[in-house]
């Protein structure tokens, strides 16, 4: 049986009366007190105990009410009612401190729950977007494959065009799966060893796979080193992915025949390097420039399939940058172009 605070106080005070009376009776037997004095002390004890009980009730009732209110508050929170409760208990000190600790805990849990809900919503949108993106290349592959199989596509130039489309859509699927893999591994805590990087050699290895595409689309791509940059230590694998995604984005949102510029500079104290990739594309309005690195955001107002991809490239690049001692900034003008700048901090492997 669990007793309330009020019951425990009443039992304690009432129990003190017979205990005190017994002690006084023993004192009378031992002739420490005479009969009149013993009776007086006994009555005084009873009256004092009653007054003590009354005074305790006066002080304890508000405390019990606060504890009941606090209990209701905790039950509501336990039942999933995470709405903020601004009720404050200013006294006694222990209840005040307990309430403050509970409010702090409730606030942190509420923030975590809101974050979980937000992440779940983002994941749902991400899955829906990826499912949408997968349907288009798959439908195209199925359609052209059936056309080739059934003999509907017979002319040589149509057959060649069909194969080109099949390869393009297969590459698009590969990119989608690659993005999905990177999304899964982004928050696993995977680390990369620092490597000595010669920037010109790194750029050659990154740009080489784009050579045929740039030539086929009649584009101009120029790389400009503003000053001589010595080899430095950085995380090669994330850096390659960041630059690849930014270059993909520049090609995706600029027209065939346009220009891509890559400008590399080192700051005066030689501890950071800026790699700026500029295009002559559609541009991004100022109010959207802060959102382009969100996981579920795409620059297109509608999900325009002509750009391809999953729309995750910038999100992946930004996450990798934040995790690996780098930063991405953006400047853009509508119908003029966009510049994405990666700021790398050289790693000091001796520290």
From Swiss-Prot:
Recite the UniProt keywords alphabetically. ATP-binding, Cell membrane, Kinase, Membrane, Nucleotide-binding, Phosphoprotein, Transferase, Transmembrane, Transmembrane helix, Two-component regulatory system, Virulence
Its post-translational modification remark reads: Autophosphorylated.
Give the catalytic activity: ATP + protein L-histidine = ADP + protein N-phospho-L-histidine
Which PROSITE patterns does the entry mention? Answer: HAMP, HIS_KIN
EC numbers:
2.7.13.3
Could you tell me the gene encoding this protein?
saeS
Domain (Histidine kinase): give its ranges. 129-348
Which residues are annotated as modified residue Phosphohistidine in the UniProt record?
132
Describe the function of this protein.
Member of the two-component regulatory system SaeR/SaeS involved in the regulation of staphylococcal virulence factors in a strain-dependent fashion. Probably functions as a membrane-associated protein kinase that upon sensing the appropriate signal, autophosphorylates and in turn activates the cytosolic response regulator SaeR. SaeR/SaeS activates the expression of exoproteins involved in adhesion and invasion of host cells, including hemolysins (hla, hlb, hlgC), coa, DNase, spa and cell wall-associated proteins (emp, eap, fnbA, fnbB, efb).
| Membrane topology, from the record | Multi-pass membrane protein
Annotated Pfam families:
HAMP, HATPase_c, HisKA
Q: Where in the cell is it found?
A: Cell membrane
Its GO biological process terms? cellular response to phosphate starvation
Please give the organism: Staphylococcus aureus (strain Newman)
The record lists the membrane-crossing segments as: 9-29, 40-60
Q: Which SUPFAM superfamilies match?
A: ATPase domain of HSP90 chaperone/DNA topoisomerase II/histidine kinase (SSF55874), Homodimeric domain of signal transducing histidine kinase (SSF47384)
- GO cellular component terms attached to this protein's record: plasma membrane
List residues of the HAMP domain: 61-114
What is the protein name given in its UniProt record?
Histidine protein kinase SaeS
Source taxon at top rank: Bacteria
User: What are the disulphide bonds in this sequence?
Assistant: none
Give the primary localization class: membrane
GO MF, one annotated term? phosphorelay sensor kinase activity
Spell out the CDD domains in the cross-references.
HATPase, HisKA
Please give the InterPro entries that the UniProt record associates with this protein: 2-comp_sensor_kinase, HAMP_dom, HATPase_C_sf, His_kinase_dom, HisK_dim/P_dom, HisK_dim/P_sf, Sig_transdc_His_kin-like_C
């Amino acid at each position: 049986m669990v007793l309330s605070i009020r019951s425990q106080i009443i039992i304690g005070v009432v129990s003190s009366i017979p205990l005190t009376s017994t002690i006084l009776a023993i004192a009378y037997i031992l002739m420490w007190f005479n009969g009149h004095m013993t009776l007086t002390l006994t009555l005084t004890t009873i009256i004092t105990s009653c007054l003590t009980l009354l005074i305790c009730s006066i002080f304890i009732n508000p405390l019990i009410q606060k504890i009941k209110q606090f209990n209701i508050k905790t039950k509501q929170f336990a039942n999933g009612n995470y709405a903020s409760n601004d009720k404050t208990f200013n006294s006694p000190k222990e209840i005040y401190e307990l309430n403050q600790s509970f409010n702090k805990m409730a606030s942190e849990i509420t923030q975590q729950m809101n974050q979980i809900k937000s992440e779940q919503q983002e994941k749902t949108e991400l899955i829906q977007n990826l499912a949408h993106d997968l349907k288009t290349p798959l439908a195209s592959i199925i359609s052209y494959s059936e056309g080739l199989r059934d003999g509907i596509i017979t002319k040589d130039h149509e057959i060649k065009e069909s194969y080109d489309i099949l390869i393009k859509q297969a590459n698009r699927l590969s990119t989608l799966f690659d993005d999905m893999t990177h999304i899964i591994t982004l928050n696993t805590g995977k680390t990369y060893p620092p490597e000595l990087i010669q920037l010109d050699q790194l750029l050659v290895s990154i740009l080489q796979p784009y050579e045929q595409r740039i030539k086929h689309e009649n584009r101009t791509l120029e790389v400009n080193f503003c000053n001589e940059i010595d080899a430095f230590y950085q995380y090669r694998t994330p850096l390659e992915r960041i630059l690849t995604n930014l270059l993909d984005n520049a090609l995706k949102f600029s027209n065939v025949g346009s220009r891509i510029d890559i400008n590399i500079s080192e700051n005066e104290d030689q501890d950071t390097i800026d790699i700026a990739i500029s295009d002559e594309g559609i541009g991004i309005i100022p109010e959207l420039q802060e959102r382009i690195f969100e996981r579920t955001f795409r620059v297109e107002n509608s999900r325009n399939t002509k750009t391809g991809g999953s729309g995750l490239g910038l999100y992946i690049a930004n996450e990798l940058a934040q995790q690996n001692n780098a930063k991405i900034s953006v400047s853009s003008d509508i119908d003029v172009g966009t510049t994405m700048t990666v700021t790398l901090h050289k790693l000091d492997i001796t520290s």
